[in-house]
Amino acid sequence: MYRNHIQRLPGDPHSIIPLSSPLPRQTRFFSRCPMTTTQQAFLTILRASLHQEEATPALTADQWPELFRLAESHKVLPMIFEAVFPQVRQADPALAMSAKAQVRNRVILQTMRTAEFLELFQALTDAGASPLVVKGIVCRQLYPKPDHRPSSDEDILIPPEEFALCHSVMTRLGLRTTEADPDKVYEVPYRRPSSPLYIELHKHLFPPESGAYGDLNRFFADAAQRTVELTVQGHRIRTLGHTDHLLYLLLHAYKHFLHSGFGIRQICDILLFSHAHAGQIEWGHIRKCCKAVRADKFAAAVFTIGVRHLGFGPVGPWTNVDELPLLEDVLSAGVYGSADDDRLHSSTITLEAVSAQKQGRGTHSGLLTAAFPSAQALEGRYPWLKGRHWLLPAAWGDRIFSYLRENRSPGSGSAALKLGAERRALLKYYGILK
């Protein structure tokens, strides 16, 4: 998923953190510059929120809005705001009240999404389908206040042969899809008009056609035989077994890392899940699978961030690695690597490098490949390419036009290429690229 699903209640005027407000540019990972005061405060407050501890950050009046922008970019604003409400109310009462209204809106929307989703899941089960919930609501239950960890969508995994049945149930309940040919894509999005509910119905956990990570599906070929049942607000739901689910959370973050990055919330999900179910997880299997796709150092860095920055103890068979390059990339990426257009555009370089390595080609793709990437590499930015690769020239044209429109200032045209090269070096640093 690469979309921003921001919704407000009807008539809600509150928006202290507009999405168009860019985060400050971060120095790239080779610089080893120390984190800013705001970034340090953000991690300290997030840690306090996760462990229900007190947070007393020393921030100036100018730094409070910056903190909230950073929290919003990672979609953890309710968690951050609640942890520091007394301090921000004293420092800037107007900002505190405006933020409180926005957070209340987010929490109400999440409560509505959760209730509607549980009803939908029950309807699918009653119809004879065998859906599995992944991520989303399963991870939210691990937080001190689940509805303060928002999910813009819910993901459901089904056997491909059950798609027609599930589609029938969902359309009967008022959900609609914009996918022109849902039979041909691995993931079908659904919305219910005048509702915050958004569903992604997966036939596979990863797009099989992707040259960079389509092969990750092999780890979950028999996952339907290892499911577990959870109770959420009185509703029974089925999900992946604990080992499979943690592996999926890690590889889902890894997939986004190969694109344009991922945010701190995904790291929190991984850490909370791994500690909640540590005794039931087959750690040797997790490490073996990660190593098979050269993601073992990446996974180790994720867990090291938890130990050194978020107050978690060691878990699993991971050795300490230098986590700071990954943490710097995470903080500047936003929730799904969508902090800025340069970062989104740069994903074509990193994806091409990984695909080339898996296919035995050189990983140093040239300018031609960067300008005219494959359909698979562009599907994140252009969802309408899924199953319709004949539209690739249109995507190329739109992409080039966007570059020309966005890069009118002198020296800015190479920003995405430069960032792509830097992130390719980051993948090499963690052993993903040779």
For each predicted feature, which ranges?
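Low-complexity proline/serine/threonine-rich segments in eukaryotic and viral proteins
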Residues: 1-31, 97
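Conserved NTP-donor binding/palm subdomain of two-metal-ion nucleotidyltransferases/polymerases, i.e.
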Residues: 34-152, 158-434
